[in-house]
From Swiss-Prot:
Coiled coil: none
Single GO BP term: animal organ development
Superkingdom in the source lineage: Eukaryota
Tagged with keyword rRNA processing: no
Entry-linked Gene3D superfamilies: 1.20.1250.10
Signal sequence annotation: 1-17
One family name in Pfam for this protein: Hormone_1
Protein encoded by which gene: gh
Protein name: Somatotropin
Amino acid sequence: MDRVFLLLSVLSLGVSSQPITDSQRLFSIAVSRVQHLHLLAQRLFSDFESSLQTEEQRQLNKIFLQDFCNSDYIISPIDKHETQRSSVLKLLSISYRLVESWEFPSRSLSGGSAPRNQISPKLSELKTGIHLLIRANQDGDEMFADSSALQLAPYGNYYQSLGADESLRRSYELLACFKKDMHKVETYLTVAKCRLSPEANCTL
């Protein structure tokens, strides 16, 4: 982790002299980080689902499809076409807010295993990297708005004392939303990174 922060610091110092090269390197680190988090989210969700009875899975999936994730309050592209039309800075800004929205909820995902305990620190590393990318890709026409004032509603009553059935639902919801959001961030960062390679085909 120290090596990652050192590299991020070095790259941030060189942004003004070699913006394209530095952005490429930062993007590679960020994409690698979010890919790891997305795979981890998929595994945690799969493990949780496998511990449920078939009827429990069916009911929870039905409820989740009718519910909303906390991050749905963050405006993002509605489909792959809008994603491809979005600017690099817009994709980075949305990714930053999505990652930031998990800083507190991720604590409830930690504990019990080494992979779970990696979630919060890796989210913090990813947020730092995306912030450096935003700084490197800002221009006078398009500026990143600070999201520090952005307040999202909590995940229902997830943090309260719940009955067994409700606790099961909240755990399912949290893991499903985390997987969904990490998939979004991976998609946005991958498309944004591709934009820096004019010869590349960025079709989703």
